[in-house]
């Protein structure tokens, strides 16, 4: 078994040096022509559980102290789990069993105790505080445990503004309050800040692993936007969508939404004020392609959009104006990532990005979001496609270190070869904010995919 684990981890890490070198390039451009190695499900258990242990040891104590929660309760029932539950349990866990209670107690310098009050104990990395018995006994045991430990602020997952922090059902909350004394009831508070910080913060081992995960998604896009998949005049956008979906299935990767593919072409109107441009149908020579894909692997998710071009007969590369259009999209990315400053809110980053684009008469739209355990993760929202002004609550969240984002948005550019028609360059590349700098996790698209 040890040899299997060692081989699996080695296979997972073998692509890292090249990725690091690519990230050091000035523009961080990188072309990935095929997906890399994917671990078998059995071999994914060790790295996932190792990353979970690191998160518990390196992140959770500081986050609980930062948010002022000294006891965090994550209470679940089978098939009605709190969304946070799956980020807290070791592999291979598929669901809560009966009623599953996770308790985290910050004891200061002694660290955070990770406890369960369950019919079935989890074992490492949890200590069983109670097991067996019936449901009434289980709830009484939870109440007794809380009373014995006497926490000052008891965090529960209820939130009006953050969906992923609102996983405690009404029935479980009522049952909890029944087993607490009035004094302890008064100490119960929302754990929403702790939940957001737990979900948005990446451990060092996750940052080391993430490039491989993002490169898988980018590699499948390269396959899809090539003559291996597309025959101009015959292949449809739906064919490419389903190729991508099937390819993820073959690689045993979990998509978190169905891939989309669309085309823009000369003569198909793209209004200057249109929020999105593109249509579906048969792919023809001269078409501009766009796709949006997202997968999750080793519990970390990707969200990627890239552009392609279908060469006409005799063309070896894209028209110069399309090359310039993609460069404009990269310039918008630079304005956005250059506006990332720790402590700035999402709304402040958006305003700085818009100001920089307007100074260059660039028509841009920014709708960037955090990334991690979820494709649309909590953290600072930086614009919405239908709102380029401040976003209440989520846009007011500040930027922290060791957080990942999908750098998502678009620019509009006129194409002389298309009689001045507008074209939309829609990009989404995954990045991490670390050490005061934004680095693309597996590079970014700086050259077109070309179907020859």
Where are the predicted features?
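Bacterial N-terminal signal peptides that target proteins for export
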Residues: 1-9
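Bacterial N-terminal signal peptides
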Residues: 8-17
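Sec/Tat signal peptide C-region and signal peptidase I cleavage site
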Residues: 18-22
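Active-site neighborhoods and metal-handling regions in enzymes and metal-associated proteins
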Residues: 23-452
């Amino acid at each position: 078994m040890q040899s299997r684990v060692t081989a699996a981890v080695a296979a997972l890490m073998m692509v890292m040096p090249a990725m690091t070198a690519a990230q050091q390039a000035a523009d961080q451009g990188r072309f990935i022509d095929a997906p890399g190695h994917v671990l078998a499900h059995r071999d994914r258990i060790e790295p996932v559980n190792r990353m979970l242990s690191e998160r518990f040891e390196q992140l959770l104590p500081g986050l609980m102290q930062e948010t002022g929660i000294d006891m965090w309760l994550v209470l679940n029932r089978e098939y009605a789990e709190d969304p946070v539950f799956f980020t807290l349990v070791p592999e291979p866990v598929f669901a809560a069993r009966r009623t599953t209670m996770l308790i985290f107690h910050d004891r200061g310098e002694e660290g955070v105790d990770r406890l369960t009050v369950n019919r079935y104990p989890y074992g490492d990395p949890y200590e069983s505080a109670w097991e067996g018995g019936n449901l009434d006994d289980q709830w009484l045991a939870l109440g007794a445990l809380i009373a014995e430990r006497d926490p000052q602020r008891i965090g529960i997952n209820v939130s009006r503004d953050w969906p992923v922090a609102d996983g405690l059902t009404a029935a479980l909350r009522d049952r909890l309050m029944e087993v607490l004394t009035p004094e302890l009831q008064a100490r119960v508070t929302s754990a929403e800040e702790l939940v957001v910080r737990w979900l948005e913060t990446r451990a060092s081992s996750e940052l080391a692993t993430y490039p491989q995960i993002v490169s898988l998604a980018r590699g499948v896009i390269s396959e899809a936007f090539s003559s291996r998949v597309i025959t101009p005049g015959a292949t449809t956008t739906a064919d490419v969508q389903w190729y991508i979906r099937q390819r993820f299935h073959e690689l045993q990767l979990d998509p978190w939404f169905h891939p989309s593919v669309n085309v823009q072409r000369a003569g198909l109107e793209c209004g200057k004020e249109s929020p999105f441009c593109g249509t579906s149908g048969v792919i023809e020579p001269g078409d501009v392609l766009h796709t949006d894909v997202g997968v999750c692997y080793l519990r970390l998710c990707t969200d990627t959009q890239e552009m392609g071009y279908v060469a006409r007969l005799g063309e070896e590369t894209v028209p110069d104006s399309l090359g310039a259009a993609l460069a404009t999209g990269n310039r918008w990315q630079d304005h956005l990532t250059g506006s990332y400053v720790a402590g700035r809110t999402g709304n402040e980053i958006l305003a700085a990005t818009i100001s920089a684009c307007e100074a260059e008469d660039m028509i841009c739209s920014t709708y960037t979001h955090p990334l991690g355990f979820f494709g649309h993760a909590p953290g600072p929202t930086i614009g919405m496609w239908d709102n380029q002004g401040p976003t209440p609550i989520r846009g007011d969240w500040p930027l922290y270190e060791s957080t990942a984002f999908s750098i998502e948005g678009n620019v509009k550019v006129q194409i002389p070869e298309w009689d001045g028609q507008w074209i939309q360059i829609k990009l989404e590349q995954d990045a991490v904010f670390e050490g005061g700098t934004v680095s693309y996790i597996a590079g970014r698209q700086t050259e077109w995919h070309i179907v020859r």
